[in-house]
């Protein structure tokens, strides 16, 4: 069976910042009425923002001292939890709890997101899919601004190759807003099914905090790296697939499916963490 879109949820921010919105997400355009999804996303960062390191090169013991009071500190780790539900055949809502540990503070809740997705073009098998999405993120940690986001999710599949691109405009709102203009964040994935249930791919994420003052490439956040995908319930014709259907659960949901991926991201600029190990898991029912 051709490869199916991977882990998804609406909106994303990227390595190196203390986000009110979630980290390392790539959204798929598919919406199915009555389908619920529970998702976990996590990331562990290695190497602080190179542009913020001190000059003695000895590392990370006193990293917190190099940041201004109003400056976002990079993350050591993040753990996000999301629930999605398809309201109609075209429209779904989701809510997320965003948690993390910046290098200047202890682990805690960073924000809460409420998001929507509307499917404009349904992809059936190969071809194009298109959806519009948006959301509002409530900053919970001290000094964090609320954020709004809106944009398009595009995907294209040919054979065993799946391409997904997310482009979202982002803006800060509320008393803690530090920028007046819109920012832009993106994430793209190229995924290829190597054998049934297993795929490999490349993902890239980036963010321009303020389009009106974008600055040079090195002052933006960009990262890229490989990802491995495992979808034990991806093949409806496989007798060993890890699905539960109505034959096994009378009166229950038509299908239950698990998907996972693990990847590594490498920072391309001084403003991005050196590397990050990212992992995602999703249960659909």
Stretches found by the model and what they are:
Residues 5-19:
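C-terminal segment of classical bacterial N-terminal signal peptides
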Residues 2, 10, 23-26:
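Low-complexity intrinsically disordered segments
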Residues 18-285:
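Transmembrane beta-barrel domains of Gram-negative outer membranes and organellar outer membranes
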């Amino acid at each position: 069976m051709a490869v199916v879109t991977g882990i998804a949820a609406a909106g994303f921010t990227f390595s190196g910042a203390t986000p009110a919105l979630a980290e390392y997400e790539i959204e798929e355009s598919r919406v199915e009425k009555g389908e619920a999804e529970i998702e976990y996303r996590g990331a562990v960062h290695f190497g602080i923002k190179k542009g913020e390191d001190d000059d003695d090169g000895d590392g990370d013991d006193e990293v917190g001292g190099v940041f201004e009071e109003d400056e976002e500190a990079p993350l050591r780790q993040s753990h996000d939890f999301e629930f999605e539900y398809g309201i109609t055949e075209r429209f779904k809502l989701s809510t997320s709890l965003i948690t993390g540990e910046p290098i200047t503070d202890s682990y805690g809740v960073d924000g809460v997101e409420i998001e929507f997705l509307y499917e404009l073009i349904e992809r059936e098998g190969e071809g194009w899919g298109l959806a519009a999405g948006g959301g509002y993120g409530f900053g919970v940690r001290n000094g964090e601004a609320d954020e709004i986001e809106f944009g398009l999710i595009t995907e294209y599949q040919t054979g065993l190759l799946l391409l997904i691109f997310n482009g979202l405009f982002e803006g800060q709102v509320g008393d803690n807003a530090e920028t007046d203009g819109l920012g832009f964040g993106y994430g793209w994935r190229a995924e290829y099914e190597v054998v049934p249930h297993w795929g490999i791919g490349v993902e890239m994420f980036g963010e321009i905090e303020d389009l009106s003052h974008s600055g040079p490439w090195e002052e933006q956040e960009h990262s890229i790296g490989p990802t491995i995908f495992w979808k034990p319930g991806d093949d409806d014709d496989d007798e060993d697939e890890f699905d539960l259907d109505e034959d096994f659960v009378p009166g229950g949901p038509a299908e239950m499916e698990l998907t996972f991926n693990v990847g590594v991201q490498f920072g391309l600029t001084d403003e991005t963490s050196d590397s990050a190990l990212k992992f995602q898991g999703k249960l659909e029912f």
